[in-house]
Each structure stands twice: as C-alpha cells, then as structure tokens.
Amino acid sequence: MELKLLNDQGAQSATLQASDALFGRDYNEALIHQVVVAYMANARSGNRAQKGRAEVSKSTRKPWRQKGTGRARAGMASSPLWRGGGRVFPNSPEDNFSQKLNRKMYRAGVASILSQLAREDRLAIVENFSVEAPKTRLLSQKLKGMGLDSVLVITDEFDENLFLSSRNLHKVLVLEVSETDPVSLVHYDRVIVTKGALAKMEEAWQ
C-alpha cells in the first residue's frame, strides 16, 4: 500500500510503501463497530448509582391500615410507587460493562480502520512533526499552513513541546503509538503519522 509523504506545507512530496497487512485490509464495518464499542465500554469508570427501596431513607412503618380507609393499600413510604421512594432497578457502581475482545480481533479492527483512512486519503505520513516551543500559536499556524483542522497526530516518541502546544486545541490530539486507540482514529478527520511512528505501528500491530 502506497501512502502519501507530506511536506511542511501539506503538499505531497513523495510516496512510501507501507505494509498491506496494516493498510491494505478490506473494510469490515461490523468488526470496527465491535472494537470501538468494546473499547469505550471498557473505559467506563462505573460510578453511576441510584438507590433502591432498601437504601432510601424512609420509614418502614405502614402508612395506614390495610382496609377500611378507602385509600389504596400501601406498605411503606420507600415504595417505588411513591414520590421519594426507591428505584425499581437501580443502577449500581458494581454494574459490569466490560466486553471481552481478543488481541487478534483488536488488531484486525485497528488495521481495518487504518486501511479505510488510507483509501479515503485521510491518512498521511510526515518526516517529522514538531514545534520549536510549547506554544499553541505555533502549532495552530503549522496546522493551518498544512491545511489541517481536525487532526490526530501519531508520533514515535513523546515530544513535550508538541504535547503542550496541542492541549488547548480541541480538534487536535497528539498521541504516541502505544497510546493510539480505535476511538481516536475514527474521531478525527485526518490522521498524521511520523515515519518513526509508522515503523513502530507496523512492528506492533501486524
């Protein structure tokens, strides 16, 4: 699979031969959906909680006698039928949202995403991607000069200047290869990969 090599102006300067195992796969929508949903489900913190009828702070005394008042029978104020009562099926922090996804499926899903990005010309390679100082303005100008707006930048190693410069740009995300995930790959309009990161991706995900 041939990928575009961009210069600092965002124009194609050459092409690179990349692994077909990573960038030449067929588009598998069902697998991509499963990988993305599983990743998001496994990232949930599981902190939502509600109270059931046994947990709300209400008296357990019977509000009125069973028969003879003409009113509907009632057992206790914590009943889900009453205002302020407990929920019937309360959410719990112990709810388990995790989904099992084996490594082979995960890698195949990521490769399918990368292949589709390459086919749609939304993925490109750069020799190097950096800024001279940790300033948002410098990175914003660099991206504007390359014609990029919503972009994921994948680097081979941590670049503090680049990372700090990107934190205030909500349409820009900078990740190392080891941090790259399927949700980020499908979220941004363009994906820029450094040559060093490309080599690491081919080594890790094939």
From Swiss-Prot:
Pfam families: Ribosomal_L4. GO terms for cellular component: ribonucleoprotein complex; ribosome. It comes from the Bacteria. Residues 59-70 have a biased composition (Basic residues). Part of the 50S ribosomal subunit. Belongs to the universal ribosomal protein uL4 family. One of the primary rRNA binding proteins, this protein initially binds near the 5'-end of the 23S rRNA. It is important during the early stages of 50S assembly. It makes multiple contacts with different domains of the 23S rRNA in the assembled 50S subunit and ribosome. Forms part of the polypeptide exit tunnel. This is Large ribosomal subunit protein uL4. It comes from Aromatoleum aromaticum (strain DSM 19018 / LMG 30748 / EbN1) (Azoarcus sp. (strain EbN1)).
